[in-house]
């Protein structure tokens, strides 16, 4: 009880049958998580600047046809069960050993993160996808330190390039 799930997800845009639309992936995940019994906590907007040179999509310089770029992703914070209790002395010691510095706490518990830049990460394999969906080490490092204490188990169900394992 009291475990957290942190999900980094961006919305997507697609043109299907000549119709441009936004797909709100974060809203779909929140809805599914709540159906599974998770409580939704305030999320973080990660201002992840794109590598695209243009700040718009669509018809460019012509009005009523351009769209802003998506330069942010959501970090959804979910909790399963009630608030976590630290009743045993060993649990209390692990919690104290995991304490954050004042500066970290103030920066990390803000609802908008500007200071972590997205990175292009090549997989190196010409037969695979052109790029990975990996996120910067700092993103996993912060979330693990914010929502777990020393000795906790950290799960990354996708594993990918191992960023979460390295941060844990």
Task: Report residues per predicted region.
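Core catalytic lobe of class I
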Residues: 1-168
């Amino acid at each position: 009880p009291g475990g957290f799930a942190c999900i980094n997800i961006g919305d997507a845009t697609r043109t299907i049958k000549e119709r441009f639309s936004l797909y709100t992936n974060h809203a779909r995940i929140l809805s599914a998580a709540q159906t599974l019994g998770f409580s939704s906590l305030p999320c973080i907007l990660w201002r992840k600047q794109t590598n695209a040179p243009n700040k718009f999509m669509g018809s460019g310089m012509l009005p009523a046809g351009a769209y802003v770029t998506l330069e942010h992703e959501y970090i959804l914070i979910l909790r399963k069960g009630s608030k976590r209790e630290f009743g045993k002395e060993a649990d209390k010691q692990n919690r104290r050993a995991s304490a954050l510095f004042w500066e970290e706490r103030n920066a990390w518990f803000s609802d908008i993160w500007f200071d972590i830049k997205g990175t292009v990460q090549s997989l190196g394999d010409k037969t695979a996808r052109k790029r990975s969906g990996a996120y910067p080490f700092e993103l996993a490092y912060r979330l693990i330190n914010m929502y777990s204490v020393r000795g906790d188990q950290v799960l990354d169900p996708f594993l990918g390039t191992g960023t979460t394992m390295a941060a844990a």
